[in-house]
Amino acid sequence: MTKDFYRQLDPVEEKIVPPENAIVISSEAKEATVNEKEAKQGVLSQRVMKYIGENELVDGISVRDPDYLKRFFNERRKQFSAKWDKVTNKIDDIAGRYYAREESFTSTIASLHTDPNERLIPGLLSILVASMTGSVLARRRTWLLRATMPIILGSCCFAYAMPTTFRNTMGLIHNLEMNTFPHFTERQDRVWKETKRLSTASVQYYYDAKKWLNKDVEKTGNAIKNWTGVNVK
């Protein structure tokens, strides 16, 4: 006769649950408890129990947890947790520095081109053409001209085509120089200020001399006119 797997199940008949009036005595698991005295005397079962741990009933289930295994996994878990925290902190630190640099870079690039009237793509193409022109013009010259002429023409075109962006770029380069080479930048600033002062003074001297010369020429012309009646102006 085949077994009917779909029969009506009686838990008591199948001994799944005890009868209603039955008395169930829970085992204290004394037979699985380590006896230190017998373990020291070399009783095999007690030595085995010492390694597999004492038996404990947890919700009616026999559980063994040796102390050395608990210590082992506790130490390994702590080591893994410490290493994991160290790795995650390192990753967070690297990611934070990367995002900070990315934000600094994007904000710096955005701060360079601030004038909407300056068309970026045509300006960059003009700078490229000017640099290539300088390279072509200095192709058969000395190495110094070949190295500097593209930079000079490109910079001049940059300052002419996009003056606001050029000033912002020069300010950025100056800040980078100040952070990297502060002493050199200070000397460079002093030289630049002195050069500007001399240039301004030279222009002023030129206009003063021109004004003085025009005044003297005018006086001389008036004197000749008064003496001879000839207009020499």
UniProtKB/Swiss-Prot annotation:
Disruption phenotype: Moderate changes in the mitochondrial morphology. The chain crosses the membrane at residues 120-137, 142-164. Pfam families: ApoO (PF09769). GO terms for biological process: cristae formation; negative regulation of protein oligomerization. Keywords: Membrane, Mitochondrion, Mitochondrion inner membrane, Transmembrane, Transmembrane helix. InterPro entries: MIC26/MIC27, Mic26_fungi. Component of the mitochondrial contact site and cristae organizing system (MICOS) complex, composed of at least MIC10, MIC12, MIC19, MIC26, MIC27 and MIC60. This complex was also known under the names MINOS or MitOS complex. Belongs to the apolipoprotein O/MICOS complex subunit Mic27 family. Yeast Mic26 subfamily. Component of the MICOS complex, a large protein complex of the mitochondrial inner membrane that plays crucial roles in the maintenance of crista junctions, inner membrane architecture, and formation of contact sites to the outer membrane. PANTHER family: MICOS SUBUNIT MIC26. Present with 5220 molecules/cell in log phase SD medium. This is MICOS subunit MIC26. The lineage of its organism: Eukaryota, Fungi, Dikarya, Ascomycota, Saccharomycotina. The gene is MIC26.
